[in-house]
Amino acid sequence: MGFDLYGEKPIQNEFEHQERWDELSAMSYDERESKGLEDEYYTLMSKYENVNPGAYFRNNVWWWRPLWDFVCENCADILTEKDMNGGHYNDSHIISRRKAEAIATTLEEVIESDETKMWIKEHEDNMEQAKRNNAQVEAELEELKKLVEVETGNPDIYPAIYPDKFKKKYDEIYGKRDWASSYPFNKDNVINFINFARQSGGFSIC
């Protein structure tokens, strides 16, 4: 699962393969596939998006959540509550061109600030702490698995079919997992988003 952002009226920068890109884009998937053009299509797509960053931006859910939280934290005077909530769902919520440009400007201003550096460090520290915690959780789950195998005599047993007393213990241990380890955040992703927002002409969040 991920979040796909599409520029509403993206700036069209000069692209040396524009004619070929238009030709391939006009074809259906089946047509490109039958002619062996899919690899060329995706190669040109990557080049096109690099030249035209306002056309498309994607993050998987793990990267998007902390990025959008960062946007909301710094752009509360730009975004409405509806905008902020809309960024957490794949419901095609639209951020206007004016707001997109204002977001880009604001993030450019804060990206090198001490506050942002602290935000990034705290996020990295939380991730490392979560990873250490989760390593301990995995070790406990492995010990429990060995115990269950001995008790049941079944080396192929898995949590869903653990006897009740062991399933309860499994749920208790698993509940200690810290999901902060799954949500990365870094400066490069913010910069890529800034470039997209600046040239998107407004964007939809899908």
Model-predicted regions and their roles:
Residues M1-C206:
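Acidic (Asp/Glu-rich) sequence patches and key acidic residues
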